[in-house]
């Protein structure tokens, strides 16, 4: 039954969840909030939705780029390099991004009498991003259920698994990961050095899956 909305960025995690839950998804939503890599990731969201026959919309959130502070909004030069868990990667946090997106997706779900919103945060996100942690998802779910007539739930099926496990699941689903984007710099190819590139490389290696990504730094 197609009773769900999914937030899909065009990244590895959300594209995997898109395929994983395709039979239940009535609508996929992407957000253009001025992210450095938006021109790279958003077309992949559209591509995979078209491939699966899932309706897809992109909602502009230009106010975030104007008023929020994050290196993810300040151009490629602002993105720090190094492992995802390092202290300097906190600069890539877009404050309460997931809360804002989940609120909008919940309103759309309620408007269409859909019962849940999927988001693809995973276990590796918890270190840096407060709005990816299990306690946040639990609290947000309580708010959306209390604040909607149809009691829309927020579900994050990958919260307790690693990115490597997501890659393994996606490989089993036959996903073409060459058509996903992770790099926060948003250049022509993945830089290979920023936190998301490092994490992506490590995930494929740990999963024992061939990495189809082209990196500028090998």
Please identify what each model-predicted range represents:
Residues 125, 204-205:
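Glycine-rich nucleotide phosphate-binding loop and flanking beta-alpha elements
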Residues 103, 179-202:
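Local cysteine-cluster metal-coordination motifs and their immediate loop/turn environment
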Residues 148, 205-208:
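Short amphipathic alpha-helical interaction/hinge segments
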């Amino acid at each position: 039954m197609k009773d769900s909305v999914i937030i899909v960025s065009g990244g590895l995690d959300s594209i995997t969840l898109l395929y994983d839950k395709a039979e239940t998804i009535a609508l996929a939503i992407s957000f253009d909030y001025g992210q450095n890599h938006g021109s790279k990731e958003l077309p992949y969201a559209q591509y995979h939705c078209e491939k699966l026959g899932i309706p897809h919309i992109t909602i502009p959130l230009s106010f975030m780029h104007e008023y929020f502070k994050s290196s993810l909004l300040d151009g490629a030069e602002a993105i720090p390099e190094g492992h995802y868990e390092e202290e300097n990667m906190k600069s890539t946090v877009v404050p309460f991004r997931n809360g804002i997106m989940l609120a909008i997706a919940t309103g759309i779900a309620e408007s269409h009498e859909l019962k849940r919103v999927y988001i693809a945060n995973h276990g590796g996100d918890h270190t840096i991003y407060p709005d990816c942690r299990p306690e946040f998802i639990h609290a947000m779910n309580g708010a959306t259920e209390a604040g909607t007539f149809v009691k829309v739930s927020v579900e994050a099926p990958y919260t307790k698994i690693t990115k490597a496990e997501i890659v393994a699941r996606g490989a089993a689903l036959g996903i073409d990961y060459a058509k996903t984007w992770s790099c926060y710099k948003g250049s022509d190819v993945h830089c290979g050095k920023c936190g998301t590139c490092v994490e992506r490389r490590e995930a494929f290696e740990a999963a024992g899956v061939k990495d189809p990504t082209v990196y500028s730094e090998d």
